[in-house]
Regions:
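Alpha-helical phosphate/pyrophosphate-handling elements in metalloenzyme active cores
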Residues: 1-9, 18, 63-77, 238-275
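A short, charged/proline- and glycine-enriched loop
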Residues: 282-285
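Catalytic-site or vestigial catalytic-site microsegments of nucleotide-handling domains
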Residues: 287-297
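Conserved helix-loop-beta segment at the catalytic/binding core of cyclic-nucleotide signaling proteins
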Residues: 323-329
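Phosphate/oxyanion-binding active-site loops and adjacent basic polyanion-contact surfaces
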Residues: 51-59, 239-247, 311-322
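Divalent metal-dependent catalytic cores for phosphoryl transfer on phosphate-bearing substrates
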Residues: 1-168, 172, 230, 280, ...
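Extended, charge-enriched "interface" segments that sit outside catalytic cores
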Residues: 158-236
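Extended catalytic cores and adjacent scaffolds of nucleotide/polyanion-binding enzymes
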Residues: 296-310, 316-319, 323
Length: 329
């Protein structure tokens, strides 16, 4: 498996969460093929005699239904490696799937935070809470220390609606939390159909492997920026897109480190699959920061005519420059 294949596998490892919330239950009426249903016994961990982490079944179904789109840009062997890394990350059977699992664990450590004072007993009791709970505004988690050493928290909760990312304020600005802002299978199904419609447009495109990776990155950003990654918290504030992006970044670092220093990893085969751990005092991750000097002069050295438009254009250019640097590195 190549580094590029591992990247796409890790980036798309949780696409099944999106698909599952738009579909029925595993043992109910759904869009799953018989092949995907049978695969559940192999790729899902077992909990109290039942398969858990069932979203991986829908991850497999996503690839199965859309394989012809992928095969326009990559070979069958490449697609097979990508699918394996994504689908087996909860019960890995090789080092690459175990790397995705480890990256998923590390990235998930950023998801498990509590919002504090806000509770919704109905969501606590709902078996469909993973379909109902919306992505929360992270600013509501702020606790401001007062002069008497007490902490002030947000007076109300705000959440994001399930809408494609756009420049319209009503799509991207949070709304006050209420029964009207809860999500549902119907809302997810509509959102999923819009995502698939955009994905199918790739059938008319022609680009290389890198072009496919970048296109899928921005396509998932458009549709999963507003989807909560982890729904066991009452008020999750990490999106599925951010979790997928961080998982892919960590997985690539672990893959590179494993290629250079395999002796730093401990492997173990258990009933839960092929598991991998790092030795203590081993640091495979490096965070890179970029500083574009002189940006204030660049930003504000503009004429007064159409100043707002020029300022937005230059700000966008700087943002895309940083993104291009990140992609290149």
């Amino acid at each position: 498996m190549t580094r590029e294949e591992l990247y796409l596998g890790s980036f798309l490892h949780d696409i099944g969460k999106f698909y599952q919330r738009a579909d029925g239950a595993l043992n109910d009426k759904n869009e799953l093929s018989e092949q995907s249903k049978k695969l559940a016994e192999i790729i899902c961990p077992e909990h109290n005699g039942f398969p858990s982490h069932q979203h991986v079944v829908w991850t497999n179904e996503f690839f199965e239904k859309n394989q012809q789109i992928f095969l326009r840009f990559i070979s069958k062997d490449q697609l097979s490696n990508i699918v394996h890394a994504a689908v087996y990350h909860h019960r890995p059977d090789n080092p690459e799937a175990a790397i995705v699992q480890l990256a998923d664990w590390w990235a998930s450590g950023m998801d498990r935070s509590s919002m504090g004072i806000f509770e919704d007993p109905q969501l606590e009791k709902s078996e469909l809470r993973f379909r109902e709970i919306p992505l929360n505004n992270i600013l509501c988690a702020l606790r401001v220390k007062q002069s008497d050493n007490s902490f002030q928290t947000a007076s109300r909760q705000s959440v994001f609606r399930l809408r494609p990312l756009s420049l319209h304020a009503h799509d991207i600005m949070p709304s006050d939390y209420s029964n009207e802002t809860k999500l549902s299978t119907e809302l997810y199904r509509k959102h999923w159909k819009e995502f698939i419609a955009d994905l199918e447009k790739l059938e008319k495109r022609s680009f290389d492997y890198r072009g496919l990776s970048i296109t899928l990155y921005y396509l998932l950003k458009k549709y999963t920026w507003c989807i909560p990654s982890f729904t066991q918290d009452n008020h999750p504030c990490i999106s599925l897109f951010e979790h997928s992006k961080v998982t892919a970044a960590i997985a690539q670092c672990l893959f590179d480190f494993y290629q250079d220093k395999p002796e730093s990893f401990r492997t173990n085969t258990t009933p839960k699959g092929y598991q991998m751990e790092l030795d203590e005092n081993v640091f495979p991750l490096l965070i890179a920061g970029f500083d574009l000097s002189g940006i204030q002069d660049y930003l504000y050295n503009i004429s007064s005519a159409n100043a707002a438009k020029s300022l937005r254009g230059r700000s966008f250019y700087l943002q895309m420059t940083l993104e291009a640097l990140a992609w290149q590195i």
